[in-house]
């Protein structure tokens, strides 16, 4: 998928280089500041959940580092222009296309599967922890949210 930012065309190509950039720039950090290498999975979840900031992050990451950095406003304008090109009234066609491209990319698919494995481990931890949690409602909510996220991601992969 391509977006136009000013006079530049920014191509979003789900290859090894983008996978590396996403993991480098969007991964969470452990207590020591090291990367958890979960950026691809987190980005995929944001795409599946139709989080608009994920589109902005993708455009900014795909812009050449040699050229002027892309601002949030420029990325949002590029999304608006793409919506006009697609004659779309909402962002669903963009999200759907990006989701499909991520699923079709071997690099991204592998990382997403690892992310789901980590979420499933976290779910086991949440369930065990909920047995002794003081706030049962919050614990149950966290479990339900994590189960829903796993379900949405697995559905998108199938």
Regions found by a protein language model. Name each.
Residues 1-25:
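Short, extreme N-terminal segment that most often corresponds to the first beta-strand
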Residues 1-6, 29-46, 53, 65-158:
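Charged interaction scaffolds used for protein-protein
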Residues 56:
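Alpha-helix-centered segments that form part of catalytic cores
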